[in-house]
Amino acid sequence: MTELPPYWLRDNCPCAECRDPRNGQKLFQIDDLPEGLAVAGSTEADGHLEVLWSDGHRSRYPLEWLDRADEGDGRTERGKRLWTAADFAPGIPRARWEDYLADPAEQAAVLAAVRDSGFAVLRGVPAVERQVLRVAESFGYVRVTNYGELFDVRVEPDPNNLAFTSVAIAPHTDNPYRDPVPTLQLLHCLENSATGGDSGLVDGFKAAAILREEAPDAFEVLTRTPVPFVFRDRRTELRADRPLIDVDPRGRIREVRFNNRSIGTVRADDPKDLDAFYAAYRRFAAITLRPELQLTFRLGPGDCLVFDNTRLMHARTAFQQDGHRHLQGCYADLDSLNSTLAVLHRRAAALDAIAALFAGEGAGEYLGEEVTMAEHMLQAAAAAEAAGAPEHLVAAALLHDIGHFHGALHGRDLMEGQDNRHSDSGADWLARWFGPEVTEPVRLHVAAKRYLCAVEPGYREQLSEASEYTLSVQGGPMDERQAAAFAELPGARDAVAVRRWDEQAKVAGAPTPGFEHYRPLLAALMR
């Protein structure tokens, strides 16, 4: 491991001195590192590589991170599902809007479909104007263009775009004349009673991959020839010179811009280059029109199509004006969608880790009580719920003793006479995902016991034998000055409430909901 380039290894030091724990941003400049930086020593322990540097700094790297392959930014063909229409014979990626809003797992599945397959359809979005903006805002931000924050796709008397007519539209990407191009497009169907007007999608990455396989020279021409995409009307003049197929430095397909209507005059010093471009352009266009690549479906009122505008080409069949066809659309960007998806996955992983504690260590003895640790915390949460407590206090009651599993000392150490300060270690661990409205009652719930024993006559007599013992280890009842100071703390009242539920939650065999009952509540509180 120590054969790794030293400046690369040190530049990626994850310690709090080198990176802000809240956001991972570096706290030093690369030229702050000394000349001749070298590894002075290293050891492997507990799944980590520990490095002592020649300047005295110490770093600790997870071995799993050192072995991890380059993930990229998720924008290239790597890891994507390149598809033909037959791949969706069982059905296209879709979900109910109400389920998407209510269930983080359902939202993650929809966003992952857009990332991996390039699109998804939400069903049951209210068929009223401007709802498409709400869909975009559910995962990101609306991209405003010269068409406004949203646009209507219907027949216009004086259209400035073929989209606003009833004619058929061949597969294309939108706004190729804009740099950066809007990377996501949303189309929400309000009405579709006309004959025709079916929607179509083509996987541009798949078409480009076919071209690369069948005619690699043509593929290479389209990756290196700048194409002027232009748009103008009375108020707008836009141009972007980009290749039809854009690849990353490793040669992986990253973006397709394809819109015959918007291509301006391609120029080259050598006419042979123009011949090569047009031969490649025509071949690529023919591939996009192959029947096996054409996925056709009909949007009904309430359907909202979300798709990757840097990958998928969308199309429309002609329609008759014997009925009405009205869609509203808007643009958004993949960075927000990918960010939201990553956060959803991060939260799900955190909830899985907490659930594993309840099912694993939580199934063990709870400090000499007649219930397990998990039963105790679930009973506390159930008591909070029964009392009509706000969600953040139900969460605090559920998680108040999570610190017994973290920190230098375990819960068993507390019973052996060492204060494991589980309220602090638990709050610190939970602070990675929850705000102070959850973590501070957790942090203060031990102090709340000491406070109540000092100020509330008869409270101490209610303590169980184990709780009485831990009280002595944790400092005993507060004195008058300590109690007054505690009462002034911002989270004191909530901590006292959690403490009362804590003391109630020691009944052997009491029925309670399981951890999964509280997962949606916790997910809604995570940040």
Describe the role of every protein-language-model region:
Residues 45-47, 57, 115-116, 385-391:
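Short, solvent-exposed loop/edge-beta patches enriched in aromatic
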